[in-house]
């Protein structure tokens, strides 16, 4: 997804399907109805103009329309909670071992519909970075 103003790209973000593993060591995981949001960027000349919030609001709506159950993100809790993200441990979702979180709130998750993550849980599998 990209945001444009006056024909210039001023921001972008990406959703990728990230499977959950039932154990902290990763390994084989079933396909998931959950996507990860990353990266997100806004051009410095356009900071504090609500571009990030607007982009994410539209993107989250698109993820809902596509039928995904939830979205994970790693980042600034104070920013992402403004668009509905909560600490992922509230949903039983954690990073895999080998990727320690210095601030536990930086791993966040959002349901696409009330209760859509009920019964989900596990560890985000980062293996796709190494197998790309």
Segment roles from a protein language model:
Residues 65-69, 75-102:
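Conserved active-site alpha-helix within GNAT-family acetyltransferase domains
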Residues 6-7, 45, 111-116:
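Short loop segments at secondary-structure junctions
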Residues 94-132:
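C-terminal "cap" of GNAT-fold acetyltransferases
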Residues 31-34, 101-102:
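A short, structural micro-pattern
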